[in-house]
């Protein structure tokens, strides 16, 4: 996302007011689309479908939350599967079940990361109903989580969870193109849970992304932060790199930032010319396994939510009888 667009969406740039008429037109279109798809095209399923999505453009921390929810479901002894779009995946035949030895270029960075962190099937398809049917046909799953897909209204859902960035929140509050909203903020009143990443607000639940030990990519060994007493290169190809940079600062690591577009497919030449040790996000690291070296490291994070969320989650009527 360009710096200029950020100024319009998350600042008070005068151009936003010129775009407001188009935002109102966009609101009409998406409301009509949602009504039509829910009424005439939505497919319902015999098991709970949990959608973890957002109402804004850009990264908000959905994938770590999906991973944490999947782990909690498994701890209850339930079989869970995950569906994802597979954004920028090179593969053309869908649905496709992600394999641990797949490349991020083939299946997408987030699906590959989830498959490697959770012992459950992860299936990608731009048409999420195809992925859901695949899981129902090929695996005896009891609950399905959709990573993103809040606006994919052809897919029925039992629970909707929206994640909001606690730093950027809803920006200027306008829908596209004047603001960052995919849907009006009134949509938040219709979902089951609103989770604020690194923040809190009335009627929402708070989530923290807890940094774990830094890992050397080539050997997968954990290393101490004391290894990075001098400056490093912080490389990020994610929707909101500022959060990653802030985390490194909180850990006392000095760095030079190297920002790339979200879902950037890293190549060796992106990193070869950097003479410093490189620390990146785990999502970016899965794209670099084929050319890993001893100078490449990544910082895993883990989503943490308080007990009040989990009590409300497991008390939801759509999950009654599933634990």
From Swiss-Prot:
ATP binds at residues 56-63. One of its GO terms (molecular function) is tetraacyldisaccharide 4'-kinase activity. One of its GO terms (cellular component) is plasma membrane. It catalyses: a lipid A disaccharide + ATP = a lipid IVA + ADP + H(+). The keyword Kinase applies. Keywords: ATP-binding, Kinase, Lipid A biosynthesis, Lipid biosynthesis, Lipid metabolism, Nucleotide-binding, Transferase. It comes from the Bacteria. One of its GO terms (biological process) is lipopolysaccharide core region biosynthetic process. Its EC number is 2.7.1.130. Pathway: Glycolipid biosynthesis; lipid IV(A) biosynthesis; lipid IV(A) from (3R)-3-hydroxytetradecanoyl-[acyl-carrier-protein] and UDP-N-acetyl-alpha-D-glucosamine: step 6/6. InterPro entries: LpxK, P-loop_NTPase. The keyword Glycoprotein does not apply. Belongs to the LpxK family. Transfers the gamma-phosphate of ATP to the 4'-position of a tetraacyldisaccharide 1-phosphate intermediate (termed DS-1-P) to form tetraacyldisaccharide 1,4'-bis-phosphate (lipid IVA). This is Tetraacyldisaccharide 4'-kinase. It comes from Legionella pneumophila (strain Paris). The gene is lpxK.
């Amino acid at each position: 996302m360009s710096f200029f667009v950020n100024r319009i969406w998350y600042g008070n740039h005068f151009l936003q007011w010129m775009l407001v008429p188009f935002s109102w037109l966009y609101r009409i279109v998406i409301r009509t689309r949602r009504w039509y798809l829910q009424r005439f095209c939505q497919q319902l399923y015999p098991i709970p479908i949990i959608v973890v999505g957002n109402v804004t453009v850009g990264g908000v921390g959905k994938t770590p939350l999906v991973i944490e929810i999947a782990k909690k479901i498994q701890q209850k002894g339930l079989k869970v599967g995950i569906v994802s779009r597979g954004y920028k995946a090179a593969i053309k035949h869908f649905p496709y079940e992600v394999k641990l030895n797949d490349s991020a270029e083939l299946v997408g960075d987030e699906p590959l990361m989830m498959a490697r962190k959770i012992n459950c099937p992860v299936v990608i398809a731009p048409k999420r109903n195809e992925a859901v049917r695949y899981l129902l046909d090929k695996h005896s799953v009891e609950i399905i989580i959709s990573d993103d897909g809040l606006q994919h209204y052809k897919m029925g859902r039992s629970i909707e969870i929206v994640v909001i960035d606690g730093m950027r929140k809803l920006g200027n509050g306008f829908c596209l193109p004047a603001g960052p909203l995919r849907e009006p903020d009134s949509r938040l009143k219709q979902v089951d849970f609103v989770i604020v990443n690194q923040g809190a607000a009335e009627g929402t639940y708070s989530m923290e992304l807890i940094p774990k030990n830094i890992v050397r990519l080539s050997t997968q060994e954990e290393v101490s932060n004391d290894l990075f007493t001098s400056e490093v290169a912080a490389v990020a190809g994610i929707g909101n790199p500022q959060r990653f940079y802030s985390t490194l600062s909180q850990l006392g690591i000095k760095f030079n930032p190297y920002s790339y577009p979200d879902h950037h497919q890293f190549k060796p030449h992106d990193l070869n010319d950097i003479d410093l040790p490189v620390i990146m996000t785990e999502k970016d690291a899965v794209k670099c396994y084929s050319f890993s070296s001893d100078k490449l490291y990544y910082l895993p994070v883990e989503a943490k939510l308080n007990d009040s969320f989990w009590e409300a989650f497991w008390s939801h009527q759509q999950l009654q009888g599933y634990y």
